[in-house]
Every structure is written in structure tokens, then in C-alpha cells.
Design a protein with these regions (language model features):
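Charge-rich, low-complexity N-terminal segments
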Residues: 86-88
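Short, exposed beta-strand-loop hairpins at the edges of beta-sheets
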Residues: 151-156
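Basic, often amphipathic N-terminal segments
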Residues: 1-72, 93-146, 160-168
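Substrate/cofactor-recognition hotspot
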Residues: 76-79
Length: 168
């Protein structure tokens, strides 16, 4: 249980999910595999919490979903993060007032890094990410999307706990 944690993920409407998944699936079709968690919705992480907070977080998400509305966002750039052994290729939603207001609901998280909303496409060695980045950049054009759902997950192993739709 020491390595387990709960994560709040901000997810997208079906159209945005389809666009982002399509980009990632093209990478898979080209032979890239990566180390990122699979079979979870496209998202950006709002924060991590201790597993003992599960009931509290479930209640909190239900309340937040009633008070925060789904909101539009623009995806206008591809980016990279450097990790100790790997790099992360991502597509980032543009930060907005609505996104920051939602993030404020999770200011008590235990994350060790500064928050930078991003949707991971691939995690792998730097040379692999460099090649994958070129592939994504050849086809990427900015697009509009919508943040519409909050998910609560436990990792590792992956366990979906709850998903709540933001108000319309």
C-alpha cells in the first residue's frame, strides 16, 4: 500500500477524447509503445492524495461536479518534460480561469512538482521521444476541446473509483 496513491484526473468530452486518443493511437500504429499508463481516459492530473482519503475525495468530487461547469479549452502546442530516465511527450490544454478555479479545489494535494496541465501521449527514452515528437508535429494542428469530467483513480495497480460529469 505504500506505493499506492489516489489521483484526480480532469477528463474531456467524447470529441476531445477521440482527437487525443487518435493522436496517441497513431503513435502506437507507428510502433511506439512507451511506459505511460494505458486504458485510462485522456486527462490532465489535478493532484495526488493518500489512499486513506478515498471516501473524502469521492464526496468532494460529487460536490465539485455540482458547482463547476464543463468548459472549453484550446490545445495549441506539443511539449516535452524531462524525467530522470525518460522524457514525456504531451499535448497541453491552454490554462484558463475555469481551469485554475477547478485546480484550486485540489490545492491540498501532495504533489511534489509544480502543476503544468498536460495530456501525456508517450513516456520513453529521450531518443524515442525525439522521434515520436517529429511524428506528432508533422500532423498536429491546434484544436478546441472541452473539459467535462473528473475521474478518481488509484495507481498501481490501476483502479477506477469514480467519474463525475461537470455541470453543463
Amino acid at each position: 500500500m505504500a506505493n499506492k496513491a489516489l489521483y484526480i484526473l480532469a477528463g474531456y468530452d467524447d470529441r476531445t477524447e477521440e482527437i487525443l486518443s487518435g493522436i496517441q493511437n497513431k503513435l502506437y500504429d507507428e510502433g511506439f509503445s512507451g511506459l505511460q499508463t494505458r486504458n485510462i481516459p485522456m486527462h490532465f492530473t489535478m493532484g495526488s492524495y493518500a489512499v486513506e482519503q478515498e471516501e473524502e475525495l469521492k464526496n468532494r468530487l460529487e460536490k465539485i461536479a455540482e458547482t463547476h461547469r464543463a468548459f472549453d479549452t484550446e490545445f495549441n502546442h506539443v511539449g516535452l518534460f524531462r524525467l530522470p530516465e525518460n522524457d514525456v511527450l504531451f499535448i497541453a490544454p491552454e490554462v484558463s480561469r475555469e481551469m485554475l478555479a477547478l485546480k484550486d479545489e485540489f490545492s491540498d494535494n501532495r504533489d511534489q512538482f509544480n502543476w503544468s496541465p498536460h495530456t501525456t501521449m508517450l513516456i520513453d527514452k529521450p531518443a524515442v521521444i525525439q522521434e515520436a515528437t517529429q511524428s506528432v508535429l508533422k500532423k498536429f494542428t491546434s484544436f478546441s476541446g472541452k473539459v467535462a469530467v473528473l475521474h478518481l483513480y488509484e495507481f498501481w495497480p490501476t483502479r477506477h473509483i469514480l467519474s463525475v460529469q461537470l455541470a453543463d
